[in-house]
Amino acid sequence: MRNWRQAENIRLYIAVGCGAAIGALLRFLSGWVIVAILGANPLWGTSFVNIVGSFIIMFFATLTGPEGRWLVSPAWRQFVMGGLCGGLTTFSSMSLDTFLLVLHGNAAFALAYLCGLVFLSLSAAMLGLIAAQRINR
């Protein structure tokens, strides 16, 4: 019994690690596209991945939860929610961006950025919930 649990834990660790690697790569590529190709401010890259990640995690959590239509293993849930979304989203970059704005004399914009990003991320999560609930019907 103990060996089975250890094997299951190893599967979860691998799932989270693989998902996190993919999520981090997607975050990097998203930021690169937004800054290098579109010429936008790096704040848009941080905002984009946090908003998209909020939608994905709620959408997937609702579809694969107890009343969800999709039956997936715990490893798949961890791959998507803990790994992919965890690697994609970035609270630390949002914090850094906010403090850099304050340090450069843009405190009002920093507050607007922070409040706006939290609002939009929560709104995206709500849209993910609504979309998944419609599929679950």
From Swiss-Prot:
<keyword id="KW-1133">Transmembrane helix</keyword>
<keyword id="KW-0406">Ion transport</keyword>
<feature type="transmembrane region" description="Helical">
    <location>
        <begin position="43"/>
        <end position="63"/>
    </location>
</feature>
<dbReference type="GO" id="GO:0005886">
    <property type="term" value="C:plasma membrane"/>
</dbReference>
<keyword id="KW-0915">Sodium</keyword>
<keyword id="KW-0812">Transmembrane</keyword>
<feature type="transmembrane region" description="Helical">
    <location>
        <begin position="110"/>
        <end position="130"/>
    </location>
</feature>
<feature type="binding site">
    <location>
        <position position="86"/>
    </location>
    <ligand>
        <name>Na(+)</name>
    </ligand>
</feature>
<protein>
    <recommendedName>
        <fullName>Fluoride-specific ion channel FluC 3</fullName>
    </recommendedName>
</protein>
<dbReference type="Pfam" id="PF02537">
    <property type="entry name" value="CRCB"/>
</dbReference>
<keyword id="KW-0407">Ion channel</keyword>
<keyword id="KW-0997">Cell inner membrane</keyword>
<dbReference type="InterPro" id="IPR003691">
    <property type="entry name" value="FluC"/>
</dbReference>
<comment type="similarity">
    <text>Belongs to the fluoride channel Fluc/FEX (TC 1.A.43) family.</text>
</comment>
<feature type="transmembrane region" description="Helical">
    <location>
        <begin position="20"/>
        <end position="40"/>
    </location>
</feature>
<keyword id="KW-1003">Cell membrane</keyword>
<dbReference type="GO" id="GO:0140114">
    <property type="term" value="P:cellular detoxification of fluoride"/>
</dbReference>
<feature type="binding site">
    <location>
        <position position="89"/>
    </location>
    <ligand>
        <name>Na(+)</name>
    </ligand>
</feature>
<keyword id="KW-0813">Transport</keyword>
<dbReference type="GO" id="GO:0062054">
    <property type="term" value="F:fluoride channel activity"/>
</dbReference>
<keyword id="KW-0479">Metal-binding</keyword>
<comment type="function">
    <text>Fluoride-specific ion channel. Important for reducing fluoride concentration in the cell, thus reducing its toxicity.</text>
</comment>
<keyword id="KW-0472">Membrane</keyword>
<feature type="transmembrane region" description="Helical">
    <location>
        <begin position="83"/>
        <end position="103"/>
    </location>
</feature>
<dbReference type="GO" id="GO:0046872">
    <property type="term" value="F:metal ion binding"/>
</dbReference>
